[in-house]
Amino acid sequence: MLLSKYFLPVLKEDPSEAQITSHKLMLRSGMIRQQAAGIYSWLPLGLKVLKNIENIVRSNMDKAGCLEVLMPCIQPAHLWVESGRFDNYGKEMLKFQDRHDNTLLFGPTNEDMVTDIFRNNIKSYKDLPKNLYHIQWKFRDEIRPRFGVMRGREFLMKDAYSFDIDEESAVKTYNQMYKAYINTFRDLGVFAVPVIADNGPIGGKLSHEFHIIAETGESNIYYDKRFKTLKDNPDIDIEEIKSWYAAAEEKHDASKLSSDKEITSSKGIEVGHIFYIGTKYSVNMNALINDEHGKLTPIEMSSYGIGISRLVAAIIEANSDAKGIIWPIAVAPFKISLINLNIHDSKCLELAERVYNELLAQNIEVLYDDTDVRAGSKFATHDLIGSPYQIIIGPKKAANNIVELKNRKNGEIEDIDLNKRALNSYLTFFNS
């Protein structure tokens, strides 16, 4: 992509309405623009990140055996009345009447609707287990939306719902999804810790929250240091992982810890929540299944959520510095920023075009800065938008077929002599 053709409305200063790092940087880097309180348009750069995260989440749900569906964001209120949850969300749930005086709502979650789909289509234990998921926009009319997409009114969620014949099978599915979440956050390139949590208005018997560790987090998390090994050792047994200590501050009890436990504490941002619900919805909504003895029994359900739009902000909170965003490679909108410092220099132009075409041939997402602005402005822009790597082409080194490869995270710069080695031999980090 040529920067001269791209839509990237960057801001030089922090917007006055932004309080936290991610909100400031998402506005400054041209990722989003506010349309109303807590409601945002996603511009090209932001949408690329959102889609990258969505695709990684989708891939891990598919690997876990989940089946993708798409439920509407507008739901009939009678399902929520039937489940007994219609009044639970209060004014946060946006309700309205259609022209036929039917009460509808903009769904904040989908347990009620997915239970309705299940009960009308699956009747036998032979069709179990089932695990359905969708990725859809939600709306909650927060009284004080703030912090950009971190706590907006409209947000993108992945919700999965599993259906099992009995508690043993339900717990097995829950554990599979717990592991799938660990794999998901590893693939996103972030460090997330699962902690025991309350079920809240969703209801149920068992629950875990997943928190990205970030200095600017809103929750205090206490956890076993062994969680830090998950990124490099994803095959650890699920029961071993669940035996490691992890708790949010309200559930932390130091007196119950043995002296040999290595516990650390950090700030965390909740980005995922999984629930073993049990039969709450199946009983209320008459979602029954014929078991192997022909007896009607309420289905065992679990629910699994990941805040995809919230993840964008949380990743920035955990991966940024004074200059801007530092994207993990997996979610970066562009893996490389190609910066031509002098578009009027024939050698710079020739080398930039050559490198650009080589990167495209390798299917590496690259933003080629072909604009006619001063070098300092270019560096500021590309540090702000956070491409993990920058290839910098300036007249002095270009004359000798040398370009610079800069690591955005640590600032290290390496000369690439294109007379001696092919460009792709320097880009092995894309295959690691």
Curated annotation (Swiss-Prot):
InterPro entries: aa-tRNA-synt_IIb, aa-tRNA-synth_II, aa-tRNA-synth_II/BPL/LPL, Anticodon-bd, Anticodon-bd_dom_sf, Pro-tRNA-ligase_IIa, Pro-tRNA-synth_IIa_bac-type, Pro-tRNA_synthetase. It is found in: Cytoplasm. The gene is proS. Belongs to the class-II aminoacyl-tRNA synthetase family. ProS type 2 subfamily. Pfam families: HGTP_anticodon, tRNA-synt_2b. GO terms for molecular function: ATP binding; proline-tRNA ligase activity. Homodimer. Catalyzes the attachment of proline to tRNA(Pro) in a two-step reaction: proline is first activated by ATP to form Pro-AMP and then transferred to the acceptor end of tRNA(Pro). It comes from Rickettsia bellii (strain OSU 85-389). Its EC number is 6.1.1.15. PANTHER family: MITOCHONDRIAL RIBOSOME PROTEIN L39/PROLYL-TRNA LIGASE FAMILY MEMBER, PROLINE--TRNA LIGASE. Keywords: Aminoacyl-tRNA synthetase, ATP-binding, Cytoplasm, Ligase, Nucleotide-binding, Protein biosynthesis. This is Proline--tRNA ligase. One of its GO terms (cellular component) is cytosol. It catalyses: tRNA(Pro) + L-proline + ATP = L-prolyl-tRNA(Pro) + AMP + diphosphate. GO terms for biological process: prolyl-tRNA aminoacylation. Its main location: cytoplasm.
